[in-house]
Amino acid sequence: EVHKAGANSYQELVNYFKPQFLLGMSATPERTDDFDIYKMFDYNIAYEIRLQQAMEYDLLCPFHYYGITDITIDDQPINDMSDFNLLVDEKRVDYVINKINDYGYSGDRVHGLIFVSRKEEACKFSEMFNQRGFHTCALTGEASEKQRQEAMDSLESNKEGSLDYIFTVDIFNEGIDIPKVNQVVMLRPTQ
């Protein structure tokens, strides 16, 4: 996986080894950081398939994408740089819940991931969702592999009291496989 191949630490690792053949795979070879992944592999492309083609071949699960305008509180738009109190304002939490209920999910119950920008935001959102009858947890990069696995297992479970949502910061962005996830909510900027 060469998604982060432009990072110095990654370059050091790749330059340390001297393989006869180096294979790199990425779902996102065009990068916003201006790093040329193609150049790293001498512009050799063994196979390429684009998102639309992969969906046509049923290699990916179908999805619906909805862009939703965030709420304005006290005439201030909410964004990643907003005051923390605005990010977790009661009105915003209720607004988010109304929107996720409006757009729904596929299946008997929700198995959702909600991405936020800050650890404190994940913890507070989880607490406020739980107060409103949901079963959620907050996971960040500080969570152990055991904690992550237990949360994923609970999210996948259909048992009473299992997780409805995991609020996450800086993990589950890539290379994650939780087949039952049927709703993803981005409450942070995306590229």
Where are these regions (language model features)?
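Switch/connector loops and helix/strand junctions flanking conserved nucleotide-binding motifs
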Residues: 31-35, 74-76, 176-177
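Conserved interdomain linker/interface between the two RecA-like ATPase lobes of SF2 helicase motors
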Residues: 44-116
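Short glycine-/polar-rich loops that comprise or flank the Walker A/P-loop
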Residues: 18-21, 44, 60-63, 132-135, ...
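A short beta-strand element within the Helicase C-terminal
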Residues: 164-189
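A short beta-strand-to-loop transition that corresponds to the Sensor-1 phosphate-sensing loop
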Residues: 25-29, 118, 169-171
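Residues immediately C-terminal
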Residues: 1-4, 12, 174, 186
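Conserved helicase ATPase core of P-loop NTP-dependent helicases/translocases
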Residues: 113, 121-173
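Post-DEXD/H (motif II) to motif III coupling segment of the RecA-like Helicase ATP-binding lobe
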Residues: 3-65
